[in-house]
């Protein structure tokens, strides 16, 4: 691996905000950073399986197949189903690539449905309930299955692609030193497209901060995919995203391609992934995948 590539990755994966800022300072424009993302190697990935019913195969990316979260998935949450754990960790972990690797492997079982889930699921409805809900669907006319919003899933089912207004940019510049740095980076890479939840967008104040471009269904830690739909895709997620916005971009693709999405009633809750950290650090590290997200939409890769 080139020494510069390794050094840049150390800065990007650092837990020190100043290091992450130095990482962004290295690049003059979005194209340079995107090239770094494309050249970034993948962490090793290894498959571990738990045998079970193969009509629904569950694919779970995890840092430790023998850890507390993974064991809970195998022994409780998805007990009785064929489970494919994709173990991958370290500084070059890439969520999108781990998911793609596991989904491709799951095809060997020729399942009707493939569940893609995070490993930090805390509780879920009985698998028999999930199966009964899926039986009700028109299989041939259902590409994607999402879960109905509930108390255990309080986030928005609908997402909104927005164009940020100058008022929001100005607000960030006066909202404290961290937000000023954050907005400075967004200005540097011309990041004015983003995705927010519909409930947040519907707030009165948001009307002055964002211009709505398109509303679409989003998914977060759990999605069910028809195997016939998966056969039409070379890769489920775009592997160039680095642990962020790959789900938003795919959700946007579903909308653009008019994919058939069904919503079922099934309870599930999770801790919530923090691959990029939380708070200010998370916002800083999400800039990289947001740069790629903006690039794809602005350069004719996808229609707005």
Q: Where are the model-predicted features located?
A:
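C-terminal catalytic/acceptor-binding lobe
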Residues: 2-51, 212, 217-219, 239-304
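Short, acidic, metal-binding catalytic loop of nucleotide-sugar glycosyltransferases
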Residues: 48-53, 72-85
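A conserved hydrophobic helix/loop-capping motif in glycosyltransferases and polysaccharide synthases
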Residues: 51-52, 56-66, 147
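Short, acidic/glycine-rich phosphate-metal binding loop used to engage nucleotide
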Residues: 64, 88-95, 151
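Glycine-rich, basic loop-to-helix element that forms the pyrophosphate-binding segment
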Residues: 90-106
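Acidic donor-diphosphate engagement hotspot in glycosyltransferases and nucleotidyltransferases
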Residues: 99, 125-129
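Short beta-strand-to-loop acidic/aromatic patch adjacent to the donor-nucleotide binding site
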Residues: 111-122
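Conserved catalytic core of nucleotide-sugar-dependent glycosyltransferases
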Residues: 130-233
């Amino acid at each position: 691996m080139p020494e510069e590539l390794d050094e840049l990755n150390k800065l990007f994966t650092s837990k020190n905000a100043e290091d992450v800022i130095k990482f962004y300072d290295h690049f003059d424009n979005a194209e340079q950073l995107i090239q770094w993302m494309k050249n970034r190697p993948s962490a090793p990935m290894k498959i571990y399986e738990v045998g079970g019913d193969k009509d629904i195969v569950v694919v779970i990316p995890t840092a430790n197949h023998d850890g507390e979260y993974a064991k809970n998935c195998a022994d409780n949450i998805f007990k009785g189903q064929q489970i494919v754990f994709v173990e991958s960790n370290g500084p070059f972990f890439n969520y999108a690539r781990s998911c793609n690797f596991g989904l491709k492997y799951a095809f060997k079982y020729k399942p009707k449905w493939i569940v893609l889930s995070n490993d930090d699921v805390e509780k879920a409805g009985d698998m028999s309930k999930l199966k009964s809900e899926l039986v009700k669907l028109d299989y041939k006319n259902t590409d994607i299955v999402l879960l109905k919003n509930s108390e255990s899933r309080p986030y928005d089912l609908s997402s909104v692609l927005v164009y940020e207004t100058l008022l929001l940019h100005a607000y960030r510049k006066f909202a404290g030193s961290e937000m000023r740095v954050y907005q400075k980076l967004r200005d540097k890479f011309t990041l004015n497209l983003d995705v927010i939840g519909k409930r947040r967008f519907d707030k009165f104040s948001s009307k002055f901060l964002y211009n709505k471009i398109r509303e679409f269904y989003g998914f977060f830690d759990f999605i069910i995919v028809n195997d016939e739909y998966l056969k039409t895709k070379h890769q489920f997620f775009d592997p160039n995203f680095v642990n962020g916005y790959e789900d938003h971009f795919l959700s946007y693709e579903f909308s653009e391609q008019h994919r058939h999405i069904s919503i079922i009633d099934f309870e599930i809750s999770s801790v919530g992934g923090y691959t990029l950290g939380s708070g200010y650090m998370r916002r800083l590290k999400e800039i990289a995948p947001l740069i790629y997200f903006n690039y794809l939409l602005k350069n004719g890769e996808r229609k707005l």
